[in-house]
Amino acid sequence: MSVKIENIRSELLSKNWFKLHKYTFDLIDDNGTSVQQIREVYDRGNGATILLYNRPNGTVLLINQFRMPTYVNGNPDGMLLETCAGLLDNDSPEECIRREAMEETGYQVDSVQKLFEAYMSPGGVTEIIHFFAAEYHADQKVTDDVGVEDEVIEVVELPFTEAIAMIADGRIKDGKTIMLLQYAQIHGLLK
């Protein structure tokens, strides 16, 4: 099936932190049937995330961070256990994720492996996330001062097997983190 889009009109609804647009357009299917659709689209830019793992120790490095949207949606304290991540801004995905790893974990990682890209919520958000993995070792830790601006972050080192179990029991609920941990499990990054 293929579709054709015509008569696209955009209205800016908000440009506070990110941009929220209302799009009105005609969607035409293979049979030539045209249906007018209206969608709100949130443009927050693209991002990157990374799974930091230590193969000899069988551990992963995650962060516990306050996320207001999770609090609003029933997470009692708003804290979310996740892989470090950030928006690209004007950096390449590789530059972004090295910077974010340093800012959020205190580890300086040089060699990062790009795994894949994914839309995380394509029904309403434009963002593509670039997924990475990298090994970390104790000698790469350069600071205990983590987080920037008003971020509330705790660095958490866990056995990989425990992190996998935390998906099943609901202690890890972040989609990008689940995807990276399962990628590591499927591809044998840690034994």
UniProtKB/Swiss-Prot annotation:
Mg(2+) 2 binds at E100, E104, E151. Its EC number is 3.6.1.-. Residues 43-180 form the Nudix hydrolase domain. GO terms for biological process: nucleoside phosphate metabolic process; ribose phosphate metabolic process. GO terms for molecular function: hydrolase activity, acting on acid anhydrides, in phosphorus-containing anhydrides; metal ion binding. It catalyses: GDP-alpha-D-mannose + H2O = alpha-D-mannose 1-phosphate + GMP + 2 H(+). GDP-alpha-D-mannose binds at I38, R39, E40, R67, A85, G86, L87, E104, E127, D150, E151, K176. Mg(2+) 1 binds at A85, E104. A motif (Nudix box) lies at residues 86-106. It is an enzyme of class 3 (hydrolase). CDD domains: NUDIX_GDPMK. In the dimer, the N-terminal domains are swapped between the two monomers, such that residues of both chains contribute to the active site. NCBIfam families: nudix-type nucleoside diphosphatase, YffH/AdpP family, PRK15009.1. Belongs to the Nudix hydrolase family. NudK subfamily. Nucleoside diphosphate sugar hydrolase that hydrolyzes GDP-mannose as its preferred substrate, yielding GMP and mannose-1-phosphate. This is GDP-mannose pyrophosphatase.
